Amino acid sequence: MCIRDRLYLIRAPEMTDVQHIYDRVAKIAEGAALMTETTVECRFDKACSSYLPNRTLENAMYRALSHFGTPEWNSEELAFAKQIQATLTSNDRQNSLNNIAATGGENGKAYALRHRETVLANEVAPYAATENVLAASTDVGDVSWKLPVAQCFSPCFAVGTPLHTWQLVSQGRTSIAHKGMLLAAKTMAATTLNLFIDSGLLQECQQEHQQVTDTQPYHCPIPKKVTPSPLK
């Protein structure tokens, strides 16, 4: 008996699209099995939901981030980041600035123009509530459909550094990354503190979340029949 395995990861901007594509892929597999007089079994591996933004909470987090501002970089950090930038292409830098421009509205475009030669971020990028899809991984997609969630970006590497590269890994244990993560931690802590202090803000976040989920209820993307599989 000959057995062949194939693993497919299906992604789309919305979960409804993912489900439609998954159903179609399953039918294609079933059709191929019929044509070749073989059998097929679809084994569900994993799934996660898209991120649901909460604009009220995002604004609160942005105010906290703006209060702290970007880290103070010393000469050694700037010199090292400049060495990293020297290994990047012009497209790498431009793609990084384009992402900022796409998520910051008109102010984001102006910010990108101002920082074409910046080595390490020295100004908080503008915030704008946009519907642009950011293709990135997150662990809080499903959580965001159960309660209000906000996310922020923090400067942990030289401007223009592409993700999943040796350049990013090289900066991961530097003081640059440590300062960036400390800023993120302070921002999250301050945002949480403000929610404890301002019950009205918390209520606004909850009301916004309720309004969205009333029309788009959460459905766990993992079928109920699926159980944890043995470790391989």
Predicted regions and their residues:
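Metal-dependent amide/peptide-bond hydrolase catalytic core
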Residues: 4-232
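Conserved phosphate-interacting/catalytic interface
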Residues: 1
